[in-house]
């Protein structure tokens, strides 16, 4: 009850022997034993009275019913009352395949398709030459220098 080991009990005995003394120690132990016996008898009497009250009020039947209910699987009984044949559970657990028709029995609208168009200009292959600079005009070269004067 107190979770005392033998070494702890021996330590308490040695301390009691030193504090109380060898002359009075037997009388103290006898008195402590009487108190423990009296406390135990009061506890057992209280337990007996509570058992009698439970029997008189029918609480024993209630306790038995609660124990019986605790053993039964209430969740399974509820499932059987809601879905006795199991069709609802089967429909919820399986995913239906997607239907090709839309929600109202029509086929879904296809996205508008554009006719293929040819590119406006062919893209020249990269040659390593720099593209013309925006400052290059009719009298400027692509590298930005002026052409020779005639």
From Swiss-Prot:
State the Gene Ontology BP annotations. protein transport by the Tat complex
Q: Which InterPro entries match?
A: TatA/B/E, TatB
One matching Pfam family: TatA_B_E
Tell me which family the UniProt entry assigns to this protein. Answer: Belongs to the TatB family.
Please report the name of this protein according to its UniProt entry.
Answer: Sec-independent protein translocase protein TatB
Which parts pass through the membrane? 1-21
Return the GO cellular component terms, semicolon-separated.
Answer: TAT protein transport complex
Q: Its encoding gene is what?
A: tatB
Task: Describe the subunit structure.
Answer: The Tat system comprises two distinct complexes: a TatABC complex, containing multiple copies of TatA, TatB and TatC subunits, and a separate TatA complex, containing only TatA subunits. Substrates initially bind to the TatABC complex, which probably triggers association of the separate TatA complex to form the active translocon.
Q: Which cysteines are joined by disulfide bonds?
A: none
Positions with biased composition (Pro residues): 109-135
Q: Does the keyword Translocase apply?
A: no
Keywords, A to Z? Cell inner membrane, Cell membrane, Membrane, Protein transport, Translocation, Transmembrane, Transmembrane helix, Transport
Q: How does it sit in the membrane?
A: Single-pass membrane protein
Q: Which organism is it from?
A: Rhodospirillum rubrum (strain ATCC 11170 / ATH 1.1.1 / DSM 467 / LMG 4362 / NCIMB 8255 / S1)
Where does it localize?
A: Cell inner membrane
- Quote the biased-composition stretches of kind Basic and acidic residues, using this chain's numbering: 77-86
């Amino acid at each position: 009850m107190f979770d005392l080991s033998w070494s702890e009990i021996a330590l308490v005995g040695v301390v009691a022997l030193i504090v109380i003394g060898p002359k009075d120690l037997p009388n103290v132990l006898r008195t402590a034993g009487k108190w423990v016996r009296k406390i135990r008898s009061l506890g057992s009497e209280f337990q007996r009275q509570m058992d009698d009250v439970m029997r008189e009020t029918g609480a024993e039947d209630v306790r038995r019913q609660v124990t019986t209910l605790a053993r039964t699987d209430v969740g399974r009984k509820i499932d059987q009352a809601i879905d006795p044949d199991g069709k609802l559970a089967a429909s919820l657990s399986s995913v239906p395949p997607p239907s090709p028709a839309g929600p109202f029995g029509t086929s879904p609208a296809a996205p508008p398709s554009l006719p293929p168009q040819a590119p406006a200009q062919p893209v020249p292959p990269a040659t390593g030459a720099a593209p013309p600079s925006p400052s290059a005009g009719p009298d400027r070269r692509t590298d930005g220098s002026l052409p020779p004067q005639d």
